[in-house]
C-alpha cells in the first residue's frame, strides 16, 4: 500500500517514458489541484466535470507529443444542453478549461445527449509557423475514443488513450496514459498490441493513487522502461485587468453609458475561466480612453 506522501509527489505532473526493447513511447499525467482549480469557480453538472477532465488530460497528452512552442485548443460545440466545452493548454503544461451549459444535464447523460449535433475542433497554434485546425465528428460513445481516433488519423500512428476521471480521497482527479508506436517505423504492431493489452488492465485507483514509477512497474514489470523527469502541470488562466480593459474599449460609448446606468456606475467584467472580477467605474473608463489616445 502506497502512503499519501508517496503518491502525492506525482500530483499535477506529466511524465514521458520509452520502452528500451520496444519502439513504443508513452506519457502519463495526473491532474489534482489543476482539476480542482478548474472546477472551483463553477457549478458544473457531474457529467460536464468528467468531460472537462477527459479533455484536459487529452490536451496535456497532446501537447506533450508535439515538440513545439505554442498552444493547443480542444473544443466541443453542439446544439444540446452542453453548448460549449473548451480546453486550452500550452507547451509549458499550463492549462485552462470552461463549459457553457444551457439546459438540464443529468449525472449519467451520454456524450451525444449532452452535445446533440456537434463537432470536436482541435486547433494547434505554434508561436512560429502556420496554425492547424482539425474538425472531428463525434461519432464515438466517449470523448476519449473520439480523441484516440484523431491521434491515429492525424499522425498516422497506432495510438492508445486511457483517460479516467473521478474522486480520490474525496477530491476530484483526472488522469490518463498515452501509448504510441514510434514514428520512425521501427515499431511492430505486435509490440504495440502487447503493451496496450497490459495498459488496459490499469485500475482507477492505480491511476489516481500511485506515483508514476510504481504504476509503470505494476503494468510493465517485465519490461525495461526509461522514465524521464516530470513536467509540472498547472491551471493558468492568463486573464488580467489589462485584457479586460482592452475588451471594454471595444464597446461603444453609448453602450458603456447604458451599462453604467444599469449597474449603479460600475461595470463588472468576470473572467469566464477563473471567475476573477474586474471592476471599472466611469472615471477608470475615461482614463483608459485617454491613455489609448
Curated annotation (Swiss-Prot):
Q: Which domain of life is it from?
A: Bacteria
Q: Does the keyword Cytoplasm apply?
A: yes
Post-translational modification comment from the UniProt entry: Under oxidizing conditions two disulfide bonds are formed involving the reactive cysteines. Under reducing conditions zinc is bound to the reactive cysteines and the protein is inactive.
**What does the record list as GO biological process?**
protein refolding
Cellular compartments per GO CC: cytoplasm
The UniProt keyword set, sorted, is: Chaperone, Cytoplasm, Disulfide bond, Redox-active center, Zinc
Q: Where in the cell is it found?
A: Cytoplasm
GO terms (molecular function) for this protein are: protein folding chaperone; unfolded protein binding
> Which Cys residues form disulphide pairs?
237-239, 271-274
Q: Pfam families in the record, alphabetically? A: HSP33
Q: Does the keyword Cytoplasm apply?
A: yes
Gene3D superfamilies on file? helix hairpin bin (1.10.287.480), Hsp33 domain (3.55.30.10), HSP33 redox switch-like (3.90.1280.10)
- What InterPro entries does this protein's entry cite? Heat_shock_Hsp33 (IPR000397), Heat_shock_Hsp33_C (IPR016154), Heat_shock_Hsp33_N (IPR016153), Hsp33_helix_hairpin_bin_dom_sf (IPR023212)
Question: What is the documented function of this protein?
Answer: Redox regulated molecular chaperone. Protects both thermally unfolding and oxidatively damaged proteins from irreversible aggregation. Plays an important role in the bacterial defense system toward oxidative stress.
Task: Give the protein family.
Answer: Belongs to the HSP33 family.
Q: What is this protein called?
A: 33 kDa chaperonin
Phylogenetic lineage? Bacteria, Pseudomonadati, Pseudomonadota, Gammaproteobacteria, Pasteurellales
